[in-house]
Each structure stands twice: as C-alpha cells, then as structure tokens.
C-alpha cells in the first residue's frame, strides 16, 4: 500500500498525487520487482468543509487522481480511508453518511477499487434526501463558494453533538409484500420473521413468497448495486436478510 506522500510531505492536488504515486510505481516495479497487481495506491482522502479555501477541492483531487491512475496503471488497485473526508462534520451521523455515500458513488465510477469505511454507516445513494444530496455534492465538487456554510446550516443545531438516528418506520404501514421487499433492500432483520408469518397466512405456498416479494427485493438490490448506487457492505446486509427469510420458510416447504 503506497500513500501519496514524499519528501515534500502530503500531496494535496491531483497533479502532485499522480506525480508522487507514478514515481512510487516506477520504484516498486523497476527497482523492487513488484508486480503491478500487488500494488495498492492510497491517494489520501482529505477533509473537506473545513472553512479553509485550499481544502475545497480535496474530494475532487482524490477522484481525479483515481481516474488518472486507473487509466495509466489498470492492474494496480486504488484505495482510500473515507471517514477523513467528513471529519469537519463529526457528531452528525446523517450528514457524514450522506457525504461518504455520495463520495463513494462518484469515486467508484472513477475507478476506486476498495475503501476503508464503516459498513454500518453507509446510506444508499438513492435514499439520500434530495436537498441534502444537493448540498453534499455542492461541497464535494466545490460547485459554489458557500457550499460549506449551506451544508452546516442544513445540519442544524445537531452539528457537533452526538445525535442518534431514529429509524423511519413509515414503511411498516405498507402491505406485507412491500414490507418484505423493503427489508431485503435495506437489510433490516428485525421484522423479517413476523412479516413472513403474516405472509404465510396469505400465501399457501412458501415458494410463492420467495419468488414474489423476496425476489422482488433482491432484484432491486441487483439494480442498485449494478448501477453503483448501492455498495458491497449493503448488499451483504441484504443477503443476510434473504438468508434469514429463506431459513425461516424452509420447514414449511
């Protein structure tokens, strides 16, 4: 694993990051004998939203560096520690999760192969409220000079405080089929058995439940993952929900 860091210190711009990592690549392959596929670049994810103008392009610098590195060295992997990005908003989990999810959405499209991230704190890109997503992406792409201020205002009085995110249970008001599909898409295990018991009273054949609402949910997961709007840790949570559902139904089949 090679960081974008040399004798001059931490590389901050895309040009510097690429130059440092290109040099490291040559040293590793030409002198040390490493195969390109054994090298992982970490261009360093740096904090945005700090109030310091020079930091405004840090997210863009990482994404642009990733794109250029993958074009030049396709066999070499690119990684990054995502939590650094939102350090300015520590204490506001809702905003931080949205920042991480939106950043990953765009970084993966640029070629990011892997990331260090809290898998339990990743929002599904499509589920980020539009008003929050707009402000987050304004910040990530430095689209307006007041991007940081607008996101801070949106974060509200919870900025700097530890805030617990309350689960939105509005989806529990839907049909049992809709609830099962929702549980699979979002990896929610709490209500699976109760909902399956209710579904069994409406469907004589348990296989109909699997082929109906459960597979409907997994199709959505596949579409979201395939389009980059859902990430692997979230897919794993969905798979666990599916496994729990099928295990519950097996004795009745």
What residue ranges belong to the model's regions?
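ATP-dependent carboxylate/acyl-activation modules
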Residues: 1-42, 46-77, 83-253
